[in-house]
Amino acid sequence: MTETGAAVLHARRADDDDLALLLLIRHFELALLDLFGRGELNGTTHTCLGQEYVPVALRRLLADADHVFGNHRGHGHYLARFDDPAGLLAEIMGREGAVCGGVGGSQHILRDRYVSTGVQGESLPVAAGVALHLKRTEPGALACVFIGDGTWGEGAVYEALNLSSLWRLPLLVIVENNGIAQSTPTTRQMAGTVRARAEAFGVRHHGIESSDLSAIRDELAPLVAGVRSGGGPLVVEFATHRLGPHSKGDDTRDPETVRQARDNDWYRLYAEADPERFARADEAQRARVDAIVREVSARPPSRWRP
């Protein structure tokens, strides 16, 4: 079955909470781009437009005791974990109520058992260390780390996989493979495959090509349970799509690549599957994000309190 067929078949099974979260992340990211365009935000940002379904699919497979490690494209990772758009926006804008007092910004967030970083590959060895701690002190909990295809160019990835395999650590590695590392197509910077590289260390690999939440969870539930029960690390590779440029700048991809990404956008596929229900949910989350932007923008600047 084609990707489009699978999405149309199963999209009606996406419950209201899942659909609301998908659309919340989409409109949050669009709002950030609008704020940057109007000069109301400083620094840079990397949206997860097109990839929102990955953390949403995983959220019901993760437990409160698990540690989650996001990356530079991590707004969706955070929102799927906490559903706290106001706190995250305040952090990015440097406003009162910011998650980290306004000093972390878009990429560097720490809250409870969640952390994100903009340093490529850095989170994987840290996650391996946390997984070792969990294995010793909290059996059944795992460390889940999100990385991209470009991160496989970092040596720390292989050091972490080596030790994780040797020590059979409860480490879940989520690879969001959108086919391009910043502005370099993956086919031009990676020899071999993610699967082959993981399996070279004796680490299990599972590929996901669908954006259907129910199908993804059905596939991954027993595999994630195996990570928790001592089966060792697992690499799950999502073949996904990045709708926009790497950051806020020009998109260097050819028009055909961008068209393919938009054709496979979960947003379009889910909208076609259940138009009326989707439209209601879409408008509700658009209005929610608009209200949050107005409210957070009116707050005073945040203050860092060590």
Model-derived features with residue positions:
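Conserved acidic/glycine
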Residues: 1-55, 60-61, 246-306
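Glycine-rich ThDP/TPP pyrophosphate-binding loop and its adjacent helix/strand module
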Residues: 112-301
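Cofactor-binding active-site loop characterized by glycine-rich and histidine/acidic residues
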Residues: 27-33, 38-167, 185-195, 200-202
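Generic structural hydrophobic/aromatic packing signal, biased to beta-strands
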Residues: 22, 68-70, 89, 236, ...
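Feature targets compositionally biased, intrinsically disordered low-complexity regions
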Residues: 4, 100-104, 229-231
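A generic structural signal for short, non-catalytic loop/turn and secondary-structure boundary residues
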Residues: 15-18, 63, 119, 229
